[in-house]
Amino acid sequence: VPNEEQLVEYLKWTAAELHQARQRLADLTAALHEPIAVVSMACRLPGKVNSPEDLWELVASGRDAVTGFPDDRAWTFPAEPPYARLGGFVDDPAGFDAGFFGVGPDEALATEPLQRIVLQLAWEAVERARIAPHTLRSTPTGVYVGATNHDYATNLQSVPEQLLPYLGGGTSGSLVSGRIAYALGLEGPAISVDTACSSSLVAIHLACQALRRDECGIALAGGGTVMATPHTFHGFAHQKSLAPDGRCKPFAAAADGMGLAEGVALVLLERLGDARRAGHPVLAVIRGSALNQDGAGYGLAAPNGPSQQGVIRAALADAGLAADDVDAVEAHGTGTPIGDAIEAQALLATYGARRSPERPLWLGSVKSNTGHTQGAAGAAALIKMVQALRHDTLPASLHIDRPTPLATWKKGAVRLLTDPVPWPRRDTPRRAGVSAFATSGTNAHLILEEAPPPGP
C-alpha cells in the first residue's frame, strides 16, 4: 500500500505528464493550422506577363491580354465548328535554355513546352526568394504542380528515331513535377495533379497540407497549361462554351461564354515560422484552404452551388475565420452565364449573407484580363491577390456591363469590382478568398491574408 508521500509523488508525476500531453496536443493542433508563407512567385501569362510585377501592371492598368492565334504555332483549323480565332497566349513557349538544365537537344525537342516553362519558373521562384537553388539539393523540398492538356505530340505523323527515347517522358504529366525534383535534386514529395481548371489551386492546397504535416520543409506549388494544338478550342467550340469575342465577362449580364487561354504560375511556400527564422521574404500568408467534390450533381461537368458553398465554409473553418473577416474574393468567374450565376449565388449565401452593405464583399476575376488560363488559373488568381495586398488596391475586372440578372444580388452584400477600390492597411489583417472550380467537379477555395509584421 503506497504511503502518503508516494501518493503525492505519483500525483505530481501524473499532473506533469498530463501537462506535457496537453502541450504536445496544443503544439500539434497549432502546427496543423500554422499560416503558410508565400515567399516568392513566378509566372508566364498572356499579355507578355513574365513576372508577378508584369501581372500587376496588366490588371492595374486594366489591360486586355486577348489576341489572335500566334503565327509561330502553325495551327490549322477545320471548317466546323466556327469560332473566333482569339485567346490568351504566353510568349515564346518553345524558348528553353536546355543546356543550363543539363538537357540534351533531342530530349529538349521531345519535351513539351509546359515541362520546359515549369522548370524555368521553379528555378526563378527559388532565386526570387533569395535562396541559392543548389542549397535545396538533397533536402525534403516538395513539388506540387497542376498539369493539364498534354497535346504536344498528338499531331505527329511520325517521330524521328532519335526522339523516341525521350517522347514518353517529355509528354508525361507525372514528369512535370518529377523533372523539377530531378533538376534541382529535391527529395520531398513530387506530385503532379490534374483536376482540370482547379489543378493549380488544388496543388497549392496539397502543398500547404504537406508543409503543416512536416512532409516537406519548403514547397513549390502551382500549375499550368500550354496549348501545342488548337484541339482545346475545337472541343469547347463544339460545346458552344466559347465567347464569340474570346473574352471572359465574369458575372456580367453580357457574359456569353469563356475566353480560352494558357499560362503557367508557381509559388514557393514555407511554414511562416520557418520563413521568419530563415530570413526569407513573406509576401502574404495562406490561412486556410479546402477541397471538395460536386458529386452526383446536375451533370458531369456542371457546377454545383451547394458544393461551392461547402468548400468555402470548409476553408473558412480551416482558417479559423468568419465570412465577414474576408474583404474580397478572386472568383473562378469564367464568363459562362449559368456557371457564373451559380458561383454568385454560392458567394452571396456564404460571404454576402448577414454582411453589412457598408462593407460589401468585393468580387473580381483575373480571367477578364488574361482569359481562362486553365491549369494555371488558381495560381494566377493567387498571385494577383498577393500583389493586390502589396499595392493596397483591388483592381477592376474588365468587360462587366452590369451584374448578371441570373443571380439574386439583393440576397447579400456582394459587389463587382467594376472600378479599382482602395484596400488600405488597417488594425485588422486584410484577407481575400481565392476560388477554383473545374469540369472534373473538384473545387478548391483558399483564404489569403496580408503578411504579418515581423516579430521582435
What residue ranges belong to the model's regions?
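Condensing-enzyme catalytic core of the thiolase-fold
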Residues: N3-P456
